[in-house]
């Protein structure tokens, strides 16, 4: 049912949105970026591991569709590394604005490449949501650096490729659990090697910082799984649109957890996004499916 897919996509947006402000809280308590990345994937792998023995034909599925699995995993690496590096060059608000162009990229792919029939109202809601998001985040244009913009775009393309590839795989009846296992196993090994060679996984932190860092790690695992479940039900276009709830959740998290203040423009932008998402929910319920 469409309503179930909508719920999965919206919840994925909420859980993805939790990650930013809670992770920053852990950073403020002394946690490092390396540990945050490694925990994200190892916790997700631990959560999904009990399901592995019950997966029939797991290895044969990986062999048969290896290209798809490698592509979606590469996209997840683009997403993680792009966001991580971008914020070292430009401010967080601008990073999120650039990153959140990924639903527009998905929409373009849906229209021009996969040839989906997208209702004009859905196209309109995409752009009103993005405009609202731009106002809500109120980015500064000071000290723009091309490196930061490039890495934020890398993350955006990574997110878009993940969503589009996921839909392609769902049409081949590839389980969301199979995808989840592959991504998290591969990335656990990949980032452990990369961080060990070129960075540092600092475990010398307080117990409070460690426990708080577990929250975004678990949130990532839940959000990824919900996203993988949403796409086969409502399609890549609608899933991308509903994931706009992610930055709005991040804004509320920043206000509630980090005591940041919202300006009148940010409140207006937040209202536009929420109204657009509510309208999208209604429209999507009226449309059986956007994809063939």
Where are these regions (language model features)?
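C-terminal transmembrane-helix exit sites in multi-pass transporters
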Residues: 47, 52, 83-85, 102-127, ...
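Helix-helix packing/entry segments at the starts of transmembrane helices
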Residues: 39, 95-101, 166-187, 220-256
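Hydrophobic transmembrane alpha-helices of multi-pass small-molecule transport proteins
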Residues: 48, 118-138, 191-192, 244, ...
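Glycine-/small-residue-enriched transmembrane alpha-helix faces in small-molecule transporters
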Residues: 1-35, 39, 141-168, 292
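Specific transmembrane alpha-helical segments of multi-pass solute transporters/efflux pumps
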Residues: 20, 49, 55-93, 99, ...
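Hydrophobic/aromatic residues within transmembrane alpha-helices
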Residues: 26, 36, 40, 86, ...
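Hydrophobic/small/kink-forming positions within alpha-helical transmembrane segments
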Residues: 17, 21, 73, 77-81, ...
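Hydrophobic alpha-helical transmembrane segments of multi-pass integral membrane proteins
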Residues: 3-8, 34-50, 125-128, 150-154, ...
């Amino acid at each position: 049912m469409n309503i179930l897919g909508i719920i999965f996509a919206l919840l994925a947006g909420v859980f993805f949105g939790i990650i930013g402000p809670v992770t920053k809280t852990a950073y403020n308590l002394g946690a490092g970026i390396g540990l945050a990345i490694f925990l994200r994937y190892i916790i997700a792998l631990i959560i999904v591991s009990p399901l592995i023995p019950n997966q029939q034909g797991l290895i044969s599925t990986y062999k048969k569709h290896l290209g798809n699995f490698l592509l979606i995993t590469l996209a997840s690496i683009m997403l993680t590394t792009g966001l991580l590096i971008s914020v070292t060059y430009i401010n967080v608000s601008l990073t999120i604005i650039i990153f959140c162009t990924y639903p527009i990229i998905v929409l373009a792919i849906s229209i021009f490449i996969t040839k989906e029939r997208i209702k004009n109202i859905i196209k309109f809601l995409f752009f009103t949501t993005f405009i609202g998001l731009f106002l809500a985040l109120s980015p500064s244009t000071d000290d723009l650096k091309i490196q930061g913009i490039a890495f934020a775009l890398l993350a955006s393309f990574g997110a878009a490729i993940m969503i589009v590839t996921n839909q392609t795989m769902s049409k081949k009846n590839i389980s969301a659990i199979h995808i989840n296992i592959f991504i998290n196993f591969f990335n656990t090994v990949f980032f452990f090697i990369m961080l060990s060679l070129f960075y540092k996984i600092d475990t010398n932190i307080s117990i409070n910082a460690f426990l708080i860092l577990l929250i975004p790690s678990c949130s990532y695992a839940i959000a990824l799984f919900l996203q993988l479940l949403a796409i086969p039900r409502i399609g890549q276009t609608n899933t991308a649109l509903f994931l706009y709830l992610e930055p709005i959740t991040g804004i509320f998290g920043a206000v509630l957890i980090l005591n940041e203040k919202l300006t009148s423009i940010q409140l207006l932008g937040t209202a536009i996004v929420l109204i657009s998402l509510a309208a999208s929910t209604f429209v999507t319920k009226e449309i059986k499916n956007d994809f063939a």
